[in-house]
Curated annotation (Swiss-Prot):
Entry membrane topology: Multi-pass membrane protein
Keyword annotations from UniProtKB, A to Z: Cell membrane, Cytolysis, Membrane, Transmembrane, Transmembrane helix
Transmembrane segments: 23-43, 45-65, 77-97, 108-128
Major subcellular site: membrane
InterPro entries with a match to the protein in the record: Antiholin-like_LrgA (IPR023736), LrgA/CidA (IPR005538)
Subcellular location: Cell membrane
Stored NCBIfam families: PRK04125.1 (NF003155)
Name of protein: Antiholin-like protein LrgA
Length: 152
């Protein structure tokens, strides 16, 4: 049974790969580059500072949800970028090292900020997930098991 399920998953994966291979890697990279270019233009007109990469992610999400961009148009390049994300953080790490004199001025404040922001992120994520589960947008397994036992 497990082997059949794994074979089914592999077959579905190859079907998905064939859909995304309909577009060349160049076309996929160009699609992502155009979205990033649009986000750079939007960034220049925004009254508040917001990174173009964040704007680009939101634009890509909206484009995927509305069907303007199909998943196959960005899937292969997106997967490659995600698989190599550690390599993409090297420039950011070098920037931090170049900013060490600034960071040395108030290390306790920076550590405190990191701890507080992490705790706030955990709390907000917990509340958001609880809200989603209680509103039945994403029902938990426990609720599914309870409802299946009631009827049978």
């Amino acid at each position: 049974m497990v082997i059949l399920e794994q074979t089914h998953l592999v077959k579905n994966k190859t079907v998905d790969n064939k859909k995304s291979m309909k577009y060349s890697i160049f076309q996929q990279a160009l699609t992502i580059a155009v979205i990033l270019l649009i986000s750079k233009i939007i960034e220049s007109f925004m009254p508040i500072p917001m990174p173009a990469s964040v704007i680009g992610l939101v634009l890509l999400f909206i484009a995927l949800c509305t069907g303007i961009v199909k998943l196959g148009q960005v899937e292969t390049v997106g997967t490659a970028l995600t698989n190599n994300i550690g390599f993409l953080f090297v420039p950011a790490g070098i920037s931090v090292i170049n900013s060490l004199p600034i960071l040395k001025q108030s290390p306790i404040l920076i550590i405190l900020l990191i701890i507080i922001s992490t705790l706030l992120l955990l709390i907000c994520t917990g509340f958001a997930s609880q809200l989603l589960v209680t509103k039945s947008l994403f029902p938990s397994k426990e609720k599914n098991e309870e409802t299946s036992h009631v009827g049978g």
